[in-house]
Amino acid sequence: MDDNYFMKLALQEAHKAFDKGEVPVGVVVVTNKRVIARAHNLTEVLNDVTAHAEMQAITAAADMLGGKYLNECTLYVTVEPCPMCAGALRWAQLSRLVYGTPDPKRGYSNISPFLLHPKTEVTSGVMADDCSDLMQLFFKQLRG
């Protein structure tokens, strides 16, 4: 089980979002090579601008662990987190972030690369083409 394996699981979640008409972002949270949370965007379904996949996954993982910190966890997400989600990941003290495709317009790294916890290790570009292709397909269909 490597980064590609877990990113494929995150992509499965992104496809669930796509099927619901949500921006197709998916997440899995892993500790000790075990998935403890899965989530996808639910902003439209819940009518909640904060219901990003990362936020849903942070809550689910914390519930599973019985505590608010994810300092022994890796979060796999198909698209670079926005500043809101990066800030939440900082507060959760996430150990490692792995994302697929960058988000030049809304990603945290272009707005404030220091939003994540100083100890959070970041890996980007895992299955980037697959992640990017799904986003492009979604917005192409949305715009007709």
Question: Across the structure, where does each feature detected by a protein language model lie?
Answer:
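Residues that line or immediately flank small-molecule/substrate-binding pockets and catalytic motifs
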Residues: 43, 77, 101
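Short, basic and Ser/Thr-rich N-terminal targeting/leader segments
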Residues: 21-25, 71
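Short beta->alpha transition motifs characteristic of CBS
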Residues: 36-43, 119-121
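Short beta-strand scaffold segments in enzyme catalytic cores
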Residues: 25-33
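Short secondary-structure boundary/capping segments
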Residues: 27, 66-67, 112-114
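Zinc-dependent deaminase
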Residues: 1-20, 32, 81-144
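Small-residue (primarily alanine) positions within well-ordered alpha-helices
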Residues: 10, 14-17, 27, 37, ...
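Helix-adjacent hinge/juxtasegments
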Residues: 47-80, 84
